[in-house]
């Protein structure tokens, strides 16, 4: 129940007072209620973090405020006229203009550090990814496993992650598949799809967490039957405006409702060994690229990040898809405060982060170097190009970043159905084994038929 105070404490604060908590049959009828008294203000700062956080939250999105006046409740909305008046003209401040220029002319050596030391690659430590099933993120064996990776394997994994994660022979990692989207599972390459479910708005309108979990279970089961380990869903953004182009993919304008629906859907899919890419992280504004979203720290945290936060903390989400949006003047995938400080450090997220659809050119504003340096792991690209590849793959900084990214991917993948039970040792599902067997039988049959045809032809030729 704490609110975020961005101006004074710059932290979550639970104000002193009497809090009435009630259970209602509807918005007017109270079935039961209790009053809880907080004797003094509680500031969740420094070592006194909220119980759900790994580290205490503090202001990190000051640059997203922009040069605007925000409506305030102070003195009964005293600044209402100023905050809501249409401006006669508007001019973007110089710091923002400069940042946009840097985004469009990104120097791919920006994040390289010549003091970094090259890590071990290509080692023979005798480990496979299957050995890390159920291992903690901080298990020291990860370092030994990562030492086995080659630079080429890591670079390929990162560059070509469109609807898949690539195989890595050095650690016995199998290739996995990811399918889209929130209301139905679709394979964009084969055209095979599942039945359609109601859109997320309808799911949220039930206010039924059990139903949301059952929906996630259905999606997980269908994904598994179609051979996919990853699901590009659920959509977790907030209905910021009624004209949002993809509102149908998102649950609600209420972050708590959306978060509870999403967390249960994620949990449901995970019961079938499917990891969910909660998307589009974060503050996605419709269906446009490079649209800047301006907001303040309190609104960002209490409204727009809330669904993602609940899905991570309560649903155990271990994959996210990053948005095309700019948070202020910076692409969300290049915003370390979003991808690292909040997502990983504050919320305790462990897993992989994927860009939105990348093509091969990053649409002019996304690139692998900026992404890796700021907490994004892989590019949703199905075409090989310059921007989805690391520019300096032999530099120690790049190798360290690629190594960390591959760890995040493998940590997520090894939790999937690709590594449970029947295929834990080989990393291969029975249906794939059967398919390979059938292919071999057909190939042998065709080869035999070819031999018979050739022999028959030669006999007829000799007889003539």
Regions found by a protein language model. Give the residues of each.
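Glycoside hydrolase catalytic-domain context in secreted enzymes
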Residues: 1-6, 13-22, 26-28, 49-464
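Short beta-strand elements
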Residues: 29-53
């Amino acid at each position: 129940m704490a609110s975020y105070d961005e101006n004074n404490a710059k932290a979550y604060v639970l104000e002193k007072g009497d809090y009435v908590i009630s259970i209602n049959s509807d918005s007017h009828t109270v079935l039961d209620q209790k009053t809880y008294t907080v004797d003094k203000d509680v500031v969740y700062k420094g070592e006194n973090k909220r119980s759900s956080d790994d580290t205490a939250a503090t202001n990190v999105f000051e640059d997203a405020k922009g040069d605007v006046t925000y409506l305030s409740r102070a003195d009964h909305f005293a600044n209402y006229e100023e905050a809501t008046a249409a401006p006669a003209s508007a001019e973007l401040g110089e710091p923002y203009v400069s940042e946009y220029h840097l985004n469009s002319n990104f120097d791919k050596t920006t994040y390289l550090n010549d003091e970094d030391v090259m890590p071990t690659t290509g080692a023979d430590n005798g480990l496979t990814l299957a050995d890390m099933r159920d291992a903690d993120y901080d298990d020291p064996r990860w370092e030994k496993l990562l030492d086995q990776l080659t630079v080429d394997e890591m670079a390929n994994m990162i560059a070509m992650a469109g609807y898949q994660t690539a195989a890595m022979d050095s650690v016995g990692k199998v290739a996995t598949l990811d399918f889209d989207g929130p209301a139905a599972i679709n394979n964009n390459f084969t055209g095979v799809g599942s039945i359609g479910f109601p859109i997320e708005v309808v799911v949220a309108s039930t206010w039924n967490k059990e139903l949301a979990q059952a929906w996630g279970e259905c999606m997980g089961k269908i994904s598994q039957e179609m051979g996919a380990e990853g699901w590009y869903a659920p959509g977790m953004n907030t209905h910021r405006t009624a004209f949002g182009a993809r509102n149908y993919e998102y649950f609600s304008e209420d972050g708590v409702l959306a978060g509870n629906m999403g967390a249960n859907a994620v949990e449901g899919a995970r019961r079938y060994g499917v990891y969910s890419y909660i998307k589009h992280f974060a503050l996605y504004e419709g269906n446009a690229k490079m649209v800047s979203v301006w907001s303040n720290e309190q609104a960002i945290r209490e409204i727009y990040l809330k669904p993602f936060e609940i899905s991570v903390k309560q649903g155990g989400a271990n994959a996210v898809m990053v948005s095309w949006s700019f948070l202020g003047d910076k692409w969300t995938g290049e915003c370390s405060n979003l991808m690292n400080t909040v997502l990983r450090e504050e919320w305790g997220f462990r897993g992989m982060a994927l860009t939105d659809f990348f093509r091969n050119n990053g649409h002019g504003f996304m690139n692998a170097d900026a992404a890796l340096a700021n907490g994004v792991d892989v590019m949703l690209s199905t075409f090989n190009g310059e921007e989805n590849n690391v520019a300096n793959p032999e530099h120690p900084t790049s190798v360290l970043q690629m190594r960390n990214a591959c760890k995040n991917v493998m940590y997520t993948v090894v939790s999937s159905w690709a590594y449970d039970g029947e295929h834990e040792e080989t990393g291969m599902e029975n249906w794939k084994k059967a398919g390979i067997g059938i292919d071999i039988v057909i190939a042998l049959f065709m080869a035999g038929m070819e031999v018979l045809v050739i022999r028959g032809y030669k006999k007829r030729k000799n007889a003539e």
